[in-house]
């Protein structure tokens, strides 16, 4: 999530961007001084696994699962996308576009570049533009979502700037899959589950979260976040098993919903006056306006999180760390917050730890709750240890003039300029392994 304002102003700690990778095993952070990756394998320790200071003002940094492939955009060149191998410290290729890059999404098949009024679909093996979705409704926030599933490889983006229509696009067959009328208000957040068969949506009003089947577009679940006030939804995130959905906003509360079908019980004749009154009340809902009837059928939060702040941009993730379900929240205040989630009972989640994301030497904060924590906590400082374990990238390798002559340049009609990779290396690529990365060796300026 882009944590900077429209003017490029950073949040606390000079943070410009934060996002979890596709399987929630690492966190990428972009800042005024460069970008970093943190491992999410432990609650007590936030291990910095890489830091790069060669590129300043990093406003987008997206990692492909746990591989070495990373896509980078800088505020100094907001129309240029760099694709790098961060462990080798090499730039694999770059592309320039006709307008500012607002978002980049990756999976093992495709790389999506979102501009305000167009979307570019790249083949991640050679970075060639396969398709361009032109003249999309104005999308200044760069809102879009890409499924991480190889078989259900769908892209979702707003189909209107005035109402909450979702366009679903098949990025493998390069054709429109569906249009979902999700909300009356414009869209604010989108998220696919790991299987690519469910899509969660929220509107700018922020009170109702809906989940649709993909590609059919059938409404599966509807959850009410609240009725007292409208909020700005910051992020939606499914757990990897698709059983839970989290929704964070500009308020201090994160809601976690449980996606389980309601089992209908056979009707029973009421034996008391209270039971009879309840039956009459439920029957009367068929005569109420549809908006009121929907409120009777909307699910409520299974669990909640109380954040120690309000008003900060943030991004949430549901993951499993050390065999325990956790909710993680990265915020523009410069911290990563870790909470425990009880998958059986729900309720209010306990804050376990909060870690600084700016690499400072400040001691990691511990929050001890003996009733809910899985093991004793010990306060430690991890800045020095993380720095010792970080990779130190060498200067990026650049192709010589002789190599440039052997590569065929690629130019898209709307201004995406880049090049092609070698076919022999592409054919040997195995993108299902995290150690692999697309064998692109070109560079364009």
From Swiss-Prot:
Keywords assigned: Autophagy, Lipid-binding, Membrane, Phosphoprotein, Repeat, WD repeat
WD repeats mapped onto the chain: 182-222, 228-267, 311-349
Membrane topology of this protein: Peripheral membrane protein
Sequence motif L/FRRG motif, residues: 223-226
Major localization class: membrane
GO molecular function, one term: phosphatidylinositol-5-phosphate binding
InterPro entries membership: PROPPIN, WD40/YVTN_repeat-like_dom_sf, WD40_repeat_dom_sf, WD40_rpt
Compartment(s): Preautophagosomal structure membrane
Gene Ontology, cellular component aspect: autophagosome; cytosol; membrane; nucleoplasm; phagophore assembly site; phagophore assembly site membrane; protein-containing complex
GO biological process: autophagosome assembly; autophagy of mitochondrion; cellular response to starvation; glycophagy; nucleophagy; pexophagy; protein localization to phagophore assembly site; xenophagy
Location of Phosphoserine modifications: 395
Record keyword Phosphoprotein present: yes
Record SUPFAM superfamilies: WD40 repeat-like
Free-text domain note: The L/FRRG motif is required for recruitment to PtdIns3P.
Purpose of the protein: Component of the autophagy machinery that controls the major intracellular degradation process by which cytoplasmic materials are packaged into autophagosomes and delivered to lysosomes for degradation. Involved in an early step of the formation of preautophagosomal structures. Binds and is activated by phosphatidylinositol 3-phosphate (PtdIns3P) forming on membranes of the endoplasmic reticulum upon activation of the upstream ULK1 and PI3 kinases. Mediates ER-isolation membranes contacts by interacting with the ULK1:RB1CC1 complex and PtdIns3P.
Family: Belongs to the WD repeat PROPPIN family.
Protein name as it appears in the record: WD repeat domain phosphoinositide-interacting protein 2
Taxonomic source organism: Rattus norvegicus
Gene designation: Wipi2
């Amino acid at each position: 999530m882009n944590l900077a304002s429209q003017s490029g102003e950073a949040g606390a700690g000079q943070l410009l961007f934060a996002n979890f990778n596709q399987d929630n095993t690492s966190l990428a952070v972009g800042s005024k001084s460069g970008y970093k990756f943190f491992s999410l394998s432990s609650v007590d320790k936030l291990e910095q696994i890489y830091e790069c200071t060669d590129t300043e003002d990093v406003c987008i940094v997206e990692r492909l699962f746990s591989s070495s492939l990373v896509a980078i955009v800088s505020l100094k060149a907001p129309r240029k996308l760099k694709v790098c191998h961060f462990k080798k410290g090499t730039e694999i290729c770059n592309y320039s576009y006709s307008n500012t890059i607002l978002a980049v999404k990756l999976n093992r098949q495709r790389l999506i570049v979102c501009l305000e009024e167009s979307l570019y679909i790249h083949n991640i093996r050679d970075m060639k533009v396969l398709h361009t979705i032109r003249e999309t409704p104005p999308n200044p926030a760069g809102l879009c979502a890409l499924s991480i599933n190889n078989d259900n490889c769908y892209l979702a983006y707003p189909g209107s700037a005035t109402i909450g229509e979702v366009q679903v696009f098949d990025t493998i067959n390069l054709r429109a899959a569906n249009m979902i009328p999700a909300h009356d208000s414009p869209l604010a957040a989108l998220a696919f589950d790991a299987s690519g068969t469910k899509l969660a949506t929220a509107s700018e009003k922020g009170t109702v979260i809906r989940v649709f089947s993909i590609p059919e577009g059938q409404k599966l679940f509807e959850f009410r976040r609240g009725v007292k006030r409208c909020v700005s939804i910051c992020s939606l995130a499914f757990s990897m098993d698709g059983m839970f959905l989290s929704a964070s906003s500009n308020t201090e509360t994160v809601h976690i919903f449980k996606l389980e079908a309601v089992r209908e019980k056979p009707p029973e004749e009421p034996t008391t006056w209270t039971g009879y009154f309840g039956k009459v009340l439920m029957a009367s809902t068929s005569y109420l306006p549809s908006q009121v009837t929907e409120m009777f059928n909307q699910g409520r939060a299974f669990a909640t999180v109380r954040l120690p702040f309000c008003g900060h941009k943030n991004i949430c993730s549901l993951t499993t760390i050390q065999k325990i379900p956790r909710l993680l929240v990265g915020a523009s205040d410069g911290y990563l917050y870790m909470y425990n989630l009880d998958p059986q009972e729900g309720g209010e989640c306990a804050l376990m730890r909060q870690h600084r994301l700016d690499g400072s030497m400040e001691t990691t904060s511990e929050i001890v709750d003996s009733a809910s924590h899985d093991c004793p906590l010990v306060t430690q400082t991890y800045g020095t240890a993380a720095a010792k374990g970080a990779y130190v990238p060498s200067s990026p390798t650049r192709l010589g003039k002789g190599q440039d002559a052997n590569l065929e340049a690629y130019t898209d009609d709307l201004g995406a300029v880049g090049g092609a990779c070698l076919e022999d290396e592409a054919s040997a690529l195995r993108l299902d392994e995290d150690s692999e990365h697309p064998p692109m060796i070109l560079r364009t300026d």
